[in-house]
Amino acid sequence: MTASHGTAPSPFKQPRAVWAVAFACVVSFMGIGLVDPILPALAGSLHATPSQVSLLFTSYLVVTAVAMLAVGWVSSRIGAKRTLIAGLVLIVIFAGLAGTSNSIGGIVGFRAGWGLGNALFIATSLAVIVASASGGFAGAIILYETALGLGIAVGPLLGGELGSISWRGPFFGVAVLMFIALVATIAFVPNLPKPEHKTSLAAPLKALRHRGLLTMGIMALLYNWGFFTMLGYAPYPMELNAHKLGLVFTGWGLLVAAFSVFFAPRLQARFGTAKVLYVNLFCLGIVMAVIAIGVNTPAAVIVAVIVSGAFIGINNTLTTQAVMLVSPVERPVASSAYGFVRFIGGGLAPFVAGKLADATNLSVPFYLGGVAFILAIVVLASGHKLVDAAEKGAVEGEPVCPSLQRVGATPAPGYQPVIVAVGAIENADEIVDAAALMARDAGRPLEVVHIRETAVVEELAIDAEDAEQARATVLSHLDRLFTLGIAATGQVLTSVGDHAAAGRVLAQHANDIDARAIAVGRSPRGQAAQFADGSFTTAVLHNAARTVVMVEPGKAPHRLSA
């Protein structure tokens, strides 16, 4: 894999195609937060009740949920770029129409069309960025996560500023920004090849027959029930104008972004997925109870909502991770199935909350949201053994915990190789060849360990390469080394989201076979990303009782220290 020392390639040196899609991602992730500050103003201007206004969330999220079942089918037939453009066109049209509407019913209907466009966009945007990015897979993921964090944090601020002028402002703002992104996407994003494998329309629903995926999906539904109850109804008891609501939800969004990207992976690595989710869901239940009890105290509601951003950020990351851990199907199919169940919960919650608030009082929906968070703990507990088994590698299907698979011939016992760990990066051949020279000088064989990486972002999971491509890469290294007269063997190390865990697995493997040394290259992810989700190289250094060296083309290998 890679080391954290020195200067990493910048993920922000990208082609115009990547920046076009990344800009659209920022606007898309603004989505919910952009609308939240205008909810009270919208209700007042259109003489609508909070329960009627809540249908803006319901129509948007329910349509997004249902569309998630079909986006894989669509994109595998017309290609990622056309799917992306279709999504952007729909968002531009329906966001603009929502801004021109003079009735709450009209806005609710146009939000449904917006939700369809959103589903088409979010399901393909990450794949387009990865396919178009320079500097490798890691740089593309960093850029996408940056767009995610920026959109979540800035959305409420922009919504508050535009909403202070008119409740129509955020709708027109999205339409204009997405139109700019649409033009840039058409102009700069190249046509991408269609997938070789066409996704079945029924595949996501069939995937839900697997107990693990269904269990984690129901947990996500309950979590989203509580989350969108808070998001849809908390603005009313705050008694703030659009500008001040925007500032409150900006604080919330900053915590969501920070804890999603920086803290959730480290907590997961330290305590495990299930344990962190138990505590986190319980804390969210407490926050909802505070809002319910203090519903007539605006300051209490404001503080509780801002604090909830930390727990929401952790849950958004780890819930998807849990889904991918237990899912035995292809990850894009698992993402679609999970997105369907997740958004259904988010869509129904505001509708039910509105009916409850009308029939009782405003505190009851928040109590129900708190109960939903606690029920999510119960559902997670029913699947705890599945998550634990997945983290230990004892499940069928695609590998979800770091695992090694031998490629080519099995070496004789006691071969004590030099191990080189390298990912799908541009100079992988040069790193392997530099390590091969080091192994030859030491009189030892070389073992090439190729890192096959899967990134998990929000409800999406994407592979840098499939299993066959990773295997072919290792065989290519072995063939090249054979022509150079260097004895070598190969393995593929599968890593799903957790780089540090992959480093620990490699370190243990090196200890088990009494490897002479471990060679790594320089990280393409950068120090900030490595701090966020754990450094592969740091984990190797802390867990391997071996010499760890960094190899770079044209430079002498040098030893690393913990």
Regions found by a protein language model. Name each.
Residues 110-150:
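Cytoplasmic helix-loop-helix junction between adjacent transmembrane helices
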Residues 68-79, 259-273, 357:
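Helix-to-loop junctions at the C-terminal end of transmembrane segments
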Residues 175-194, 377-384:
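C-terminal membrane-cytosol helix-exit motif in multi-pass small-molecule transporters
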Residues 274-319:
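C-terminal transmembrane helical hairpin of 12-TM major facilitator-type secondary transporters
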Residues 142-187:
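Helix-loop-helix hairpin linking two adjacent transmembrane segments in secondary transporters
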